[in-house]
Amino acid sequence: APWLNSNKVGIKIIIPILAFILGYKKTLGTIDQIKVLPANTLMEKLAKVFIGKIKITGHSNIQSNGSQIFVCNHPTGIADGLVIWSTLSKKRPDIFFFANKDVTHLLPQMQDIIAPVEWKNNKRTLRSKKETLAYAKKAFEAKRSAVIFPSGRLAQRTGLKLKERPWFTSAVKLASKYDIPLIPINIKARNSFLFYLFDFIH
């Protein structure tokens, strides 16, 4: 939020309080622990930290071999990916995600499970699209399965409700091109009260 960069005395007092509430130091400690881990180990570590009690149905729709494309809503952000990974990887350890390429810049080892996507329109180029499609082609030829969040963004808060943003057609196009079944996943979840409070303030 731009107001956090203000030099006002009140803001300078608020920042350390926010850092304490949000567990900033703990987060930095977690980052230090995971930044050198292999992709799958890293995901396991984060899943243990962030995933609480969950109820899962529809396991029978997960094939043990052959490519599938799982399309999913995106209510909570990173936690969505962790839940999906912890669920699917038990049966499909070859799973990969179409996700923000910035992740692979920060954590290069995540290239093992991330097809890099440039979500920012002003940075999206023919080269970046080819990079994404080349990753997908290689993965699907190896019969790997993919996860796509077709909205490309976190669900939008509208009052007290979450509204999924419009979906891009990328998943349908890939499924058609490679003759791969599409499997829908629906996550019923919300972020914390603090998350929505800060979203409102922002």
Feature names for model-found ranges:
Residues 1-71, 81-83, 92:
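Membrane-anchoring hydrophobic helices of lipid-metabolizing enzymes
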